[in-house]
Amino acid sequence: MKKTTEIRNIFLNFFYEKKHKIMDSSTLIPDNDKTLLFTNSGMNQFKDIFLGFKKPKYIRVATAQRCIRVGGKHNDLNMIGKTNRHHTFFEMLGNFSFGSYFKSDTIQFAWELLTSKKWFDLSKEKLIVTIYYKDIESYNLWVEKTNINPKNIIFIKDKNNILYNSDNFWTMGDTGPCGPCSEIFYFFGKSINYKNIKIYDEEYIEIWNLVFMQFNLHLNGKLSRLPITSIDTGMGLERISCVLQKVNSNYSIDLFKKLIYEISKIIEIKNIKNYSLRIIADHIRSAIFLIYDGVIPSKEGRGYVLRRIIRRAIFHGNYILNKSCFFYKLVSPAINIMSYIDSKIIKKKKEIENIIKEEEKIFFFSIKKGMIFLNKNLKKIKNNILKGEIAFKLHDTFGFPIDLTNDICIKNKINVDEKGFFHAMNEQKNKSYKNSCFNKFNLKLLNNYCTKFCGYSYLKCESQILNIYNLKEEIKEIKENQEGIIILDKTPFYGESGGQVGDSGEIKSKDGVFSVIDTKKLGNYFYHYGKVIQGILKINNKITAYVNKIKRNKISLNHSSTHLLHYAINCLLDKNIIQKGSLICEKYLSFDFSYGKKINIEKINEIENIINEKIRDNVIIHSNNMDLKNALKIGAKALFKNKYKDLVRVLNIGDFSIELCGGTHANRTGDIGCFVITNFSKISSDTYRIKAITGETAIAFIQKKFNDINTISSLIKSNSNEIVNKIEKITENLKILEKKNKNLKNKIIKNYIKLIFNKIKKINNFEIIMDYFNEEIDKIILREILNKVKTNLKNGIVILASIKKDNLYIVTGVTNNLVNIITAKEIISYFKEIKSIKGGGNSYFAEAVGVVNLIDLKSMFKKIFMILSKNLK
């Protein structure tokens, strides 16, 4: 019996002999495709080559690619353990050609590897091949180039009569490279029932998919030929091992048998066929390689998928098999078994073990509480459906992923209201939008002390760590790559409030560095959210806090500018206008206000001018603390009347602006430098929003606009003072020319149509029009002529061509009542058989291009007419 590792080597050695470059597997995190959570097939690392964005280093390649199929389009998580075939982690063996060889060689390579005694030596009678029903070329090659029994070839049609929606037509997405494929199945039974072959029954297993990438799929659903054809094949290692080792389940191959045996020893269970053991065995493989490739358990993205996998396995060990912390103990034996995939993983064994151990500890305490809550609610269930909000509380409070809740409920013959679950999740997301990075932490509001804020005067200070939080609880220390929240006894970091975003920067101790991503003030404390980028930080550590100076300065300039904007609006529009909302960050400021009248661009320019005048005045910006009553007496604007304490901070800009404000500001208006309004819009019936930029950002914006004007002036050969007039004239002339062009085009079409009906040839009752232009005609015009001629035919075929300097463009159309006899696509295929041209289409319309001289075109027309004469008898 061949071992799985031997089978893997045989595959790679076979293609090495066929002049393929054996390349390493890419990581499970795609670096060239943001649309993918994980690498889920062998072709992912070559996607840019298939799309034509990148030239291949090698034109023949073979790989053993590690893959994950959880989340997104390919999600096998809920199938694990229930079927003999599915895995979240597997290896995909594949051979690839980038313009080197195509269908013929691919089919011959596959047949040789599978059936030759030198290689896999599988019985030819046991192999079934499925092909796309329109891919006659592949069928002929299978029959001619191999000794397969034609009975063992099955045509697969489109699903729901949707063109190219077939298991045997592979697409990369809604558009892009695509093509038919040949899928190879192995039959486990004794004899094939040729009258009723059911390839999706358990007796059959798909072992290899050969994808022939020869087309480009367009948004309109049409296909065009790719300039270079490619090959992408995929063979699941676990599946081919299942066949070659003559076992009915992937979980019975040597690798899984060893792994399941090791797991059964660790968790002390004798029944190695237990359903939960399959899940645990599969999930430990995924968890190990995800962590090896840089994923850490978390509450979102790839980290959350890893968390789901780990927690599902823990649950099956803890709840089903009654074992406490065990999952991390599987890391060592699993790596020993799987190190053939990448030997470097051995050095990461301890690190992977620790990460899983930490996650297991966190979840272990939640399982018991979660199960008490779930069991309590299961007793109250009506109609055998668990409410979505209950499933969401299990997810949100106890860390139960939805698939885990599903597993438990299925065991109790209960369905989960998944629609209600996702509704509850979306509701919470909407509520917590503003505080998204903090709401994932289970924070206590502490009232026995308060963080002292020194950020008005200092951007650096010495302090001490009071508390540290991870996702669920207060912890004593936080390590490298862990995210969390740190609370200090004193901070220079401004906490988000009054529309101003929180500060970022660094917190440094002698043993570690914590990167502060955001800061928020909750209760009496400032919460610093971020991630440890070096070392470790502990409670009571003495630290130095550093605010990001550049970011803070930009925010301060924008905040002072918001006050100037408020002043200018009051001066120009209405003195009673009050700010309705604002956002002040380092990139820009936005200011919302209510006003019942229309505001034109001239008013916006005036507002901008008032602000820049005050900036040039370079007046002092200063603040002082006073009691609320006195502040209101001296005319300070209070935007949030019910939210102020008795002692308030009053901000003065010169003698013209006075507001209650807790934000950070410039020292003088001149520090702002420049103020530019970039956007002005109405966000509701009576509310306007102004967006603006300041300082260096504003200067860069003005410079770009100036450069754009110069470029346009140069292109239209005008000086900048006359640019608008010149563009208006160009636009007017363009409209006139477009009208003339349209009239001329219509005349050409009209005149030609009159002449062309004299050229009708008849075959029985069918009307045939074949004509060409000995000049280059615009493709759109030629298509229009074809459509108009076709509408005037009752029962006919139209073939039109334009040719100039041997460049041929040909279109063909067939009336609706003829497509059952002959299609436009078939007619183009006849042209392609006569001469090497490229094209395609559908039943009613098809087109092609190529290099053909006039003599050859006339000859082609004669031959096509003869073919049509035979077909239309």
Swiss-Prot record:
GO terms for molecular function: alanine-tRNA ligase activity; aminoacyl-tRNA deacylase activity; ATP binding; tRNA binding; zinc ion binding. Gene3D superfamilies: 2.40.30.130, 3.10.310.40, 3.30.54.20, 6.10.250.550, Bira Bifunctional Protein, Domain 2, Threonyl-trna Synthetase, Chain A, domain 2. Its EC number is 6.1.1.7. One of its GO terms (cellular component) is cytosol. InterPro entries: aa-tRNA-synth_II/BPL/LPL (IPR045864), Ala-tRNA-lgiase_IIc (IPR002318), Ala-tRNA-ligase_IIc_anticod-bd (IPR018162), Ala-tRNA-synth_IIc_core (IPR018165), Ala-tRNA-synth_IIc_N (IPR018164), Ala-tRNA_ligase (IPR050058), Ala_tRNA_ligase_euk/bac (IPR023033), Thr/Ala-tRNA-synth_IIc_edit (IPR018163). It comes from the Bacteria. It catalyses: tRNA(Ala) + L-alanine + ATP = L-alanyl-tRNA(Ala) + AMP + diphosphate. GO terms for biological process: alanyl-tRNA aminoacylation; negative regulation of DNA-templated transcription. Its cofactor is Zn(2+). This is Alanine--tRNA ligase. It comes from Wigglesworthia glossinidia brevipalpis.
